[in-house]
Each structure stands twice: as structure tokens, then as C-alpha cells.
């Protein structure tokens, strides 16, 4: 069987010519397209090699390699190898193969189109829909999916509508994923819908001022709402008590709440006070309220001032007579609270004395502000105990060893250790010495190695994968 090969001949000297190579290779077959190439190297020398087309059979080719390979010819050692085909010849061959494949594909497409035209009634024009066509090509209605079993490839939606199942194929994983929407917003309900009534809204838009006005009179500009949306600030969820005021308004006019002046506020406070007094009169009777008023008239006054210290002031009676005769003290509200409400509070002084004194005999010495020096009296026993403790602390401080700074030697590096020696000593150890044993370190590492080398990122990825698979499985079951 004849073979046609392209042969590479290397190691040629300057004295070898093309006629010499042709005479040598013609003994084993026919030679054609012999070409000798001179290639200059970076060193400055010239490298010579040759390419030739050689036609022969298998036996002669083996003999040619055994005789001429590594043979010495005119002072040069020949090197014979099978070379790659010439690049122009290779391009021609590839073009021929591509032309043959294109002609074969055209013939197949013509055959396929003729079959589709004859067999597939859904085919229109030159469009070929990939995939399989259903055997039942009738129109699918909502009643078809309500049957048992429903039409193949269709599912029942949330409102009883027919929804097609989408099959998505992943080329990488080579798996098919089924997806069909079952959410409440996937389809719009055609009947039985409840539209929101604009009369039940809690605010309206004022086009003159470009702002929203609630039924309570609160205003919010559109620019402020846009800025909050850009910055990601959530709108306040504070409830307006007058949002539903329009429901009780028969005239249909919107009432806007305004700020009240001081006279109107005083009138409202007086009205609230009268209602509270009437409620107390119904609960406890009118006699109790009169007694409270009489007590407040003849009682002492305790003023609470922020600028100076709190002091008792006598009003009509001395302090000693007032504590013995009167059972209560009248406390006026500070001036900063007078604008809100004028109220009085009744305080029983006897109860205060019982709270802040241990015995009834010490009531005469009782004072909210301490003794004359401004500090409460201290017992003799407590002072003696404090003196003893102070003396013992001084003795311990005298007997304590001084603070010692231990520095590392010149040959070692380490931070100085500062500590108090239990006994005076002249032997100091270097600051960088490790007092932990090797066995203790190895035992600690064996116990905590699993926790310290745990890969949290990998575990999180695995958890996300498991969660996604469970979600896909849940969708298939539905």
C-alpha cells in the first residue's frame, strides 16, 4: 500500500545540496517538492534543514528510516522525522471538509422542512418551534385544569385559572427545573374583586401647596416625602386621632385643627378640673372635698426652687407649733408647671418622720438637710472602726515589698515585667522566658483545634445549597 508523507531532514552541512538528498531518497521511493531552508541563529551561525514529499510503501519507509537516520553524510549527521503537513495544503483540506458538511446539512434541512410541512399542522412559514408538540392541540380552558386529572403540562392557578408549567433546562448541571407561579400577584382576578374606595382614604392632595393634608390638619410636602424615599428613611407610623373625622361629619366639610391660645387653654383646664371635682364628689361626697380645701388654706408652704436649696418657709405660724398642731403640709407646684395645671398635693409630715427616723424619740432631731454642719451625725463606734482600719492599712503598706522592674538581658528581647516580689530576692529571670510548658500547649491545641480551624464560609455555602434544594423539591411536590 502506497504512502505519501512529508519528511523533515535536519543536520545538513553547507556542502550538501538538493541533488545529493534526492539521489539518496530515490532508492526507497519517489521524491517531490524538495526544499532546503537556511535559518540564521542568534549566535550568528546558519542552521540548514530540508522538507520533501516522499511516496513509498510501508516496508521501504521503515528501511529508509533505519539506513539514513543518524547516518553520517559529508561530515554531517542526518536526522530524519515525519513532519506535519504543509499549512497551505492543510487549509485546502479543511475547506473541502467544510464544503462537504454544508452540503449535507442543507440536504437534511430540506428533508426536515418537507416532513414538518406535511406532518405538523401548527407549522407556519419558515418558523420551526423547537421542542415537542402536544398530541392534543385543542385550546386549553380553565375548566380543563379543574378536571381530575387536569390537562398535561398545565396547573391550576390561585383563582382557578390555567397556568402552563415552564421547564428550564440548565446545560451546566444537566437538570430540568419546573417553575410555575402560584403567588397571589401572578394573575389578576377578573371577577369578585374589591376595589379600594377613595372616600375612605385618610388624606387628600392639595394641588395649590403641593402637599398632602390629613383629616386632622397635618400637612406633609411632597418634596419631603421624595427626600425620605431617596435617603431610605421610613415614614413615621404615628396614628392621627382625627383621621376618621369625616365619617362623623354630616356636612362633609373638613375641619382643620388650630393652635389654642392661653385663654382657651385656661378654659379647658378649668373645665377638666370641674369634671374631676364632680367625679370626686360623686365618689366620696362633697364633705371630703371641703375638708381638703380647709386644710390647704391653713397649712405650711414648701417651695421647690431650682436655683437655691429647698427650704421650709413659715406662713402664719412658727415651725414647732405647725409640726405639733397641723397634720399636713401644703406643697405648691413650681412656677414652671403652673401653665399646665394648678393643683396641690397633701403630704403627712408624721409619715415622713417615721420613714427617715428609727425611733420616735429622734423626731425632734429629724431634718431633711442633716445637722448644722450639713452632714448627718456619725456614731463614736463607727469613727473608732475607721481609725483602726486606717492604721492596719498603713502597717500593711509599710511591710509591702517595693515594686521591682525586671528587664531582659542584652542577648534576649522582651518587654519588662513589673510585679511585687513576695520576698526580697536578687535573682531576676529574663522578661521573654516562656513559663508555659510544651505539654500544656499541646493539650490545649488538641482540645480547641476543631473550633479554631472550622471553615464557616464553606458550611454557610452548604447550608444555602441545602435550602435551595429543599425549596425546589417543595415546588415540584406542589
Curated annotation (Swiss-Prot):
The UniProt record lists the keyword Transport: no
Q: Which GO terms describe its biological process?
A: ribosome biogenesis
Matching InterPro entries, A to Z? NOP8_RRM (IPR034138), Nucleotide-bd_a/b_plait_sf (IPR012677), RBD_domain_sf (IPR035979), RRM_dom (IPR000504)
What keywords are assigned to this protein?
Nucleus, Phosphoprotein, RNA-binding
Q: Where is the protein localized?
A: Nucleus, Nucleolus
Location of the RRM domain: 5-85
GO terms under cellular component: nucleolus; nucleus
Q: Does the keyword RNA-binding belong to this entry?
A: yes
Instruction: Give the top-rank taxon of the lineage listed in the UniProt record for this protein.
Output: Eukaryota
Gene Ontology molecular function terms on file = RNA binding
Q: Which residues carry this modification: Phosphoserine?
A: 207, 308
Gene3D superfamilies, A to Z:
3.30.70.330
Query: What name does UniProt use for this protein?
Result: Uncharacterized RNA-binding protein P16F5.06
